[in-house]
Amino acid sequence: MLSVPHLDRDFDYLVPAEHSDDAQPGVRVRVRFHGRLVDGFVLERRSDSDHHGKLGWLDRVVSPEPVLTTEIRRLVDAVAARYAGTRQDVLRLAVPARHARVEREITTAPGRPVVAPVDPSGWAAYGRGRQFLAALADSRAARAVWQALPGELWADRFAEAAAQTVRAGRTVLAIVPDQRDLDTLWQAATALVDEHSVVALSAGLGPEARYRRWLAALRGSARLVIGTRSAVFAPLSELGLVMVWADADDSLAEPRAPYPHAREVAMLRAHQARCAALIGGYARTAEAHALVRSGWAHDVVAPRPEVRARSPRVVALDDSGYDDARDPAARTARLPSIALRAARSALQSGAPVLVQVPRRGYIPSLACGRCRAIARCRSCTGPLSLQGAGSPGAVCRWCGRVDPTLRCVRCGSDVVRAVVVGARRTAEELGRAFPGTAVITSAGDTLVPQLDAGPALVVATPGAEPRAPGGYGAALLLDSWALLGRQDLRAAEDALWRWMTAAALVRPRGAGGVVTVVAESSIPTVQSLIRWDPVGHAEAELAARTEVGLPPSVHIAALDGPAGTVTALLEAARLPDPDRLQADLLGPVDLPPGVRRPAGIPADAPVIRMLLRVCREQGLELAASLRRGIGVLSARQTRQTRSLVRVQIDPLHIG
């Protein structure tokens, strides 16, 4: 495997007789390339070669284990083509590092897994729910986008779909955003499927444990693989179902080249394997809805009466019944009276209250108190934050430097104000507002998975909300402007997903559950939350993006790097070329906020972003042109001068 793009192709080698039996397709080998030994995989064995020069000899077979199966090789090729990457980069994600001792362990022959009977009543609440389970039992390639009801035990539904597929003799792959979701799904899955037939793959595993579980999938002893984003490449044969939960979560986007999204890889794999697919969530992304609109997948959505019965009552500022004369601070206060009243009512009934804040920490962002300029680090221009009430100074969130004497670089003032209030500061404020009430914080490294019964105030960041026995009595969604006000393509979609994930933990309206969102009720995203209509929101979002030419209605390639290198790549790729590829060239623009600079570029070198936009039908052609251009640049540059452009196809954050 060669890391330079212009050498991303197959090479022919002669196989010595002593290695002939072991050198089978898919095994790891060592070969000599330009005088040095490099790792590689055997792709196929042939009796002839198209190479007209002298062939070298294979040096040795590292292991006779065929780790690169035909199915995974096809997937690797397709992902590299889709995301304008190299196969070496994709293989790094797909095949873990070898652990020799684990390979030598004897694996018992896989038997028929024990699967408990599946109760279809959970899926019966949804239109086409029973039909989807029946299709899995018949090993049909049913594809669905499932809208989970509020309060739904999503892991139980996923486990039922997996068990139905395993019972039919097929394997299942389930992808979740993080370890917390993985643990939840593991408990639900092992309640229905024999634990010895289920493996979990995640980044937190050590190399030995990860390779052992990966081999269990390769050798056929694992029939159900659940894992985080990289598990989407798990080497399962006879694949019958691919599932993805909460595809709106940024954790499913791979931060390493070629930056594939687990949802896209999973759907690509389902297409190649001609198997069933399921995307589930409390909210819905425009990408998932596009699959429904195209006819590739079916809607699995509960009828409106069922949604109203299961959802909490959602109120916004204009729904409080207070006019501006009675509550002048309702539109400006961080905790208006409507939110405080909902919290007090729930606490008095003995129920816990969930308070969702967008950011962890104490005060994660500061600004000048006079001119409102954002306070930034003098060393790296990163955002400054306060770590606590007694903090000796502001700390940079990027480089960690401490600035003990804050002074605005624009107006010279030494007065600062909080731009965003974090979870710990919010917990302090609530402790003063509700004396004698337990305040629990779940954010960052301090995660609380489950609450005990009884009243409590729980301050949590999105994704860190603990489950409460019987559900929360109320939820307060604070600082809505921090989510909705972002200059980002997915700001509204992301806000609704975070809100619905929290609101789904609240009791139904019939049991007194109420959700208070501190935002104007006239905002379309807030209206979607009030009506609990994620499908309608996704429909509107998709229509709006289609109208202005944004993903998923089109494909966009983001090229990040120094201006000269970006221009050189465009010239090498011959883009744009009206005669060959109808591509719109947009930019240059600055990198979006929060997007890190490409690796290897000096800190003082300016970085730009150029965007290339094509219709969906020309996405593969755009990626192929960029791959050719990257290869040309790679061949021209030396190791000392190499500064390739970072290329991302359909990045989450466009700018």
UniProtKB/Swiss-Prot annotation:
Record has Ion transport as a keyword: no
Cofactor binding: number and manner: Binds 2 zinc ions per subunit.
GO biological process, one term: DNA replication
Binding site residues for Zn(2+) 2: C377, C380, C396, C399
Binding site for Zn(2+) 1: C368, C371, C408, C411
Parts of the chain that traverse the membrane: none
Record GO cellular component, one term: primosome complex
Similarity comment: family membership: Belongs to the helicase family. PriA subfamily.
NCBIfam families membership: PRK14873.1-4
Subunit organization: Component of the replication restart primosome.
Name listed for the protein in its UniProt record: Probable replication restart protein PriA
Organism: Mycobacterium tuberculosis (strain ATCC 25618 / H37Rv)
